Curated annotation (Swiss-Prot):
An annotated GO cellular component: HslUV protease complex
A Pfam family recorded for this sequence: AAA
Biological source species: Rickettsia akari (strain Hartford)
Name of this chain's protein: ATP-dependent protease ATPase subunit HslU
PANTHER family, A to Z: ATP-DEPENDENT CLP PROTEASE ATP-BINDING SUBUNIT CLPX-LIKE, MITOCHONDRIAL-RELATED, ATP-DEPENDENT PROTEASE ATPASE SUBUNIT HSLU
An example Gene Ontology molecular-function term: peptidase activity
Coiled coil: none
Family: Belongs to the ClpX chaperone family. HslU subfamily.
Chief location bin: cytoplasm
Keywords: ATP-binding, Chaperone, Cytoplasm, Nucleotide-binding
Binding-site positions, ATP: V29, G71, V72, G73, K74, T75, E76, D261, E328, R400
Role description: ATPase subunit of a proteasome-like degradation complex; this subunit has chaperone activity. The binding of ATP and its subsequent hydrolysis by HslU are essential for unfolding of protein substrates subsequently hydrolyzed by HslV. HslU recognizes the N-terminal part of its protein substrates and unfolds these before they are guided to HslV for hydrolysis.
Gene Ontology terms: biological process: protein unfolding; proteolysis involved in protein catabolic process
Higher taxonomy: Bacteria, Pseudomonadati, Pseudomonadota, Alphaproteobacteria, Rickettsiales
NCBIfam families: hslU (TIGR00390), PRK05201.1 (NF003544)
């Protein structure tokens, strides 16, 4: 795992802000200001790691507040950034939380979930590194079942070759595997700790583990199924769990990215008559303050410091304004970026330019049925026109409108594709108009369908 991680981090340490923006441009159209802001924030993380001495601990991330309508790319920018940087990434809506002392999730669960993601990431990398050894151990266990532990090396080698070639995939064997059957009465919520749950402990299991043993049971299964079960078992034995947890906590603390969406929904507008709701919203904001400023959160893996976690908050701010947030919270989100609403040209680019554009996705899906679809320029323009029209007349959901329009446009083709093998279908502006014009012109219908 060390080699894999080091190589990746060297690559991302070498990324300049302009290179980061170029990487984001491969998947996201427009929003240059937002891309620039996150690129600088990421580069500053790399710079901090190069600073020597105590000064490094004093340099904290400049958290970001993104302001923009739904579907303009706020979440996608943060998600792509996390993928680009090998960072644990956790997205949550601010409305999911309640003030400490009330029924619901508390804000500290954000960090618990972030660490869980980091642990899973580190485990996956570690298992990749020990995969060859784990596979060898799994084959040895299957050979013990097939030819016995006392068989000659010549016999074992012969059967090993057959396993590797897949000749014995459908051979049934009897083998001992870990017993993963859940024991006990399930789990229950811990009073006073919303979001945390506790399982009923099985005393025999606890004593068995303390003595270094683990429960197994003998099963009959095919060789290929046995390999799928035993390789992960052997991987677990080969990796250092304590080291994984230490690395995961370090990764979460120094490279974690938390994306808090809909933060405008917990802003106190003062216009609402529901005073209790206002107090509750303000309470959630106050609970977020220490988390964003820097505190220590206890998790099942150990204490985690939040001082250097990058927080990106976002909201549409249609009703509330950023100034309606608590002044202390505003101060902890010093970088503000306003994302632009999407134009017709943006919609056209979204359909065509990204490496994983919607047109490429739908073409690939239908192409699996040996049916090939091609969109003319006039069709793309018409789709973009309709997306903008419905966004203006019904509700502006940005690029997400394209998903619903394309689903309706290609519904008949998707349904009949399996019976149209070998056909090539050209989708032009007339085809788009025939499929969608009735829905678009009837706004009441458009509200439900698109």
């Amino acid at each position: 795992m060390k080699a894999t991680k080091t190589t990746y981090q060297k690559d991302h340490m070498g990324l300049t802000p302009s290179q980061i923006v170029n990487e984001l441009n491969r998947f996201i159209v427009g929003q240059e200001k937002a891309k620039k802001a996150v690129a600088i924030a990421l580069r500053n993380r790399c710079r901090r790691k190069r600073v020597e001495g105590n000064l490094r601990n004093e340099i904290v991330p400049k958290n970001i507040l993104m302001i923009g309508s739904t579907g303009v790319g706020k979440t996608e920018i943060a998600r792509r950034l996390a993928k680009l940087t090998y960072s644990p990434f956790y997205k949550i809506e601010a409305t999911k939380f309640t003030e400490v002392g009330y029924v619901g999730r508390d804000v500290e669960s954000i960090i618990r979930d972030l660490v869980e993601i980091a642990v899973n990431t580190e485990k996956t990398l570690a298992k990749t590194e020990v995969d060859i050894n784990a596979r060898e151990q799994a084959i040895e266990r299957i050979l013990d079942s097939l030819v016995g532990k006392t068989s000659s090396s010549e016999t074992r080698e012969k059967f090993k070759e057959k396993i590797l070639n897949g000749e014995l995939d459908d051979t049934e064997i009897e083998i001992s595997v870990a017993d993963t059957t859940p024991v006990g009465g399930g789990s229950f919520e811990i009073p006073g700790m919303p979001g945390a749950s506790m399982g009923v402990l099985n005393l025999g299991d606890v004593i068995g583990r303390a003595l270094g043993g683990s429960k197994t049971k003998t099963k009959k299964m095919l060789v290929k199924d046995a390999m799928a079960i035993i390789i992960p078992e052997e991987s677990e034995k080969l990796i250092d769990q304590e080291k994984i947890i230490q690395q995961a906590i370090n990764l979460a603390e120094n490279d974690g990215i938390v994306f808090i969406d809909e933060i405008d929904k917990i802003a106190s507008t003062g216009s609402s008559g529901a005073k209790n709701a206002e107090i509750s919203r303000e309470g959630v904001q106050r609970d977020l303050l220490p988390l964003i400023e820097g505190t220590t959160v206890n998790t099942k893996y150990g204490p985690v410091k939040t001082d250097h976690i990058l927080f990106i908050a976002s909201g549409a701010f249609h009703i509330a304004k950023p100034s309606d947030l608590l002044p202390e919270l505003q101060g902890r989100l010093p970088i503000r970026v306003e994302l632009n609403s999407l134009t017709k040209d943006d919609m056209i680019k979204i359909l065509l330019e990204p490496e994983t554009s919607l047109i490429k996705q739908y073409s690939a899906l239908i192409g699996t049925e040996d049916v090939y679809i091609a969109f003319t320029d006039s069709a793309i323009e018409k789709i973009a026109d309709y997306a903008i029209t419905v966004n203006l007349e019904v509700e502006d959901i940005g690029a997400r409108r394209l998903h619903t329009i394309l689903e309706n446009l290609l519904e008949d083709i998707s349904f009949e594709a399996s019976e149209m093998k070998g056909r090539k279908i050209t989708i032009d502006d007339k085809f788009v108009e025939n499929q969608l014009s009735k829905i678009i012109t009837n706004l009441d219908l458009a509200k439900f369908v698109l």
